[in-house]
Amino acid sequence: AGLTPYSVEALSCFIAGTKCEQIFLRKTEEEGFPETMCSYHRVFLGAALTGILPAPKCMIYTNLACDGNMMTFPYLKEKYSCPGFYIDVPYEKTQSSIKYVANQLKELKHFLEDITEKKITEEAVENAVTNSRKAAAHFKSQLALRKDHDPVTSLTNELYAIFMCHLLAGSETSLKYTELLLEDVKNAPKGEGLHVLWMHIMPFLQQPVKEAFNYSKTMHISACDFVADGFREMQADDPYEAMAEKMVHCIYNGSVSERIQMAEKLAKLTDADGGILFAHWGCKGTIGASGLIKKALEDAGLPTMILDGDGCNPANTSDGQVSTRLQAFAEMLEKNKEEKHS
């Protein structure tokens, strides 16, 4: 349709990288938004309220994953007098839910055609879904190799992966990314480092996290549930139902058991030594579920750490504390690994 998609999290992460996020956070406080709200959404709202954020042509949002969506987008829709499209994803993971969402996606196509005054062909929709299917297959293949291959990587690579499976899903770029990723993993040797399963988003900007994982040969992020879910395989033949299936079966929709099952599956697939669950400030769903996820995974034999922090606002987290906790967790995993092999 000729539109460039961007997200709250992506833009706020970029703004935080420029070190000027506090200006926008203060602006949202002045407007009465609670400090307990997700920092990504608060930075985004602040940027909009100060006028630095250009008015978009339209807004598309869902009730998936983040409850901040239901506050941010209706507010900005009114503020900008901007057309918006809301996709309601039912809690129940049934075929009727898939058909319900598929019908909304068909309406979304017409909505975008009206906004852009450009026709979106059914062939273009089919091609996008075909690309997504191929990308999911490549991603699944590289996950299966992670037990015996340890590519040296960085948090930036993980950030790219999130873009590819969400903002650029269905694109030729996303497909190319997974092809190259698969080749990189195939060519990477087996290392001696720890395999870590990361759950939820990553604090890409936090120095101790970068020091622990960037180009490290001692600790590797072998899988991330947020990314793996984004590259979910789709079974339905109809392209709209395939996309709807991906949304309905998202691990952030429905019971917390979905997230636990995904984590257990990824840990087994990649032979993870431990798991890190990032409890991002203001993410009520993850913070509320973190204790249940940790207990379930540890009962299944996967040592798990809940890492409290903020991926966007450094004022809400301590580098020293994060560094100490990561080091202690790594030492524990190393000890467990030595005992396992002795």
Question: Can you annotate each of these PLM segments?
Answer:
Residues 11, 63-69, 199-206, 281-288:
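Gly/Ser/Thr-rich loops at beta-strand to alpha-helix junctions
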Residues 5, 16-19, 26-30, 34-42, ...:
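Metallocofactor- and cofactor-centric catalytic cores in central/energy metabolism, strongly enriched
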Residues 40-114:
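Acidic/His-rich segments in extracytoplasmic proteins that coordinate ligands and/or metal ions
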Residues 1-26, 197-268:
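Redox- and metal-dependent alpha/beta enzyme cores, enriched for Fe-S-associated oxidoreductases
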Residues 32-50, 251-265:
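Glycine-rich, highly charged phosphate/nucleotide-binding loops
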Residues 254, 259-301, 305:
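C-terminal hydrophobic structural anchor segments
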Residues 102, 106, 110-233, 252:
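A charged, amphipathic alpha-helical module
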Residues 291-342:
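Peripheral docking tails and interdomain loops at the edges
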